[in-house]
Amino acid sequence: MSRRHVAEKRIILPDMKYNSILLSRFINNIMKAGKKAVAEKIVYSAFNKIEKKHSVDPYQTFNNAMHNVKPHLEVTSVRVGGANYQVPTHVDERRGYALASRWIINAASKRSEKMMIDKLAEELFEAANNRGVAIKKKEDIHKMAEANKAFSHFSPKKMK
């Protein structure tokens, strides 16, 4: 029997403006050093920038971006007979959105614009339109899963 304690999942309250748990998680991922007010300001300012520049609903753009970047497959490393295989596995919804938000934030922070507000606004808009670095990351993950399709019979769920 495992002695390891499984951490309970924390209840994340929805954000104040759009009443969305997904957006609240995204804000939490943006947050650095516990400065949630700064993270909220960055996200909401980016939403305002999207609305002014492209005249589209920023919340709908955010949802489209998250849905477009969310991966359906990923590879996990499985050891079989002394060899490690990259086995494609399905990504559950919660992990998919967590990966999507991480990829969007990383892609935004590496952009050339000066302020994070501008970087995030542009990356979200591009991801909503199936362009950008975050979408490329998802496509690379899917290509890797497709390339290792031959090892899918080593699926970790079947091994147990």
Curated annotation (Swiss-Prot):
Subunit note: Part of the 30S ribosomal subunit. Contacts proteins S9 and S11.
UniProt KW keywords: Ribonucleoprotein, Ribosomal protein, RNA-binding, rRNA-binding, tRNA-binding
A molecular-function term among this protein's GO annotations: tRNA binding
Protein's recorded name: Small ribosomal subunit protein uS7
Entry-linked SUPFAM superfamilies: Ribosomal protein S7 (SSF47973)
Coiled coil (residue ranges): none
Gene name linked to the record: rpsG
Keyword rRNA-binding carried by entry: yes
Entry function: One of the primary rRNA binding proteins, it binds directly to 16S rRNA where it nucleates assembly of the head domain of the 30S subunit. Is located at the subunit interface close to the decoding center, probably blocks exit of the E-site tRNA.
UniProt keyword tRNA-binding, yes or no: yes
Family membership: Belongs to the universal ribosomal protein uS7 family.
Species, as recorded: Rickettsia typhi (strain ATCC VR-144 / Wilmington)
A GO biological-process term: translation
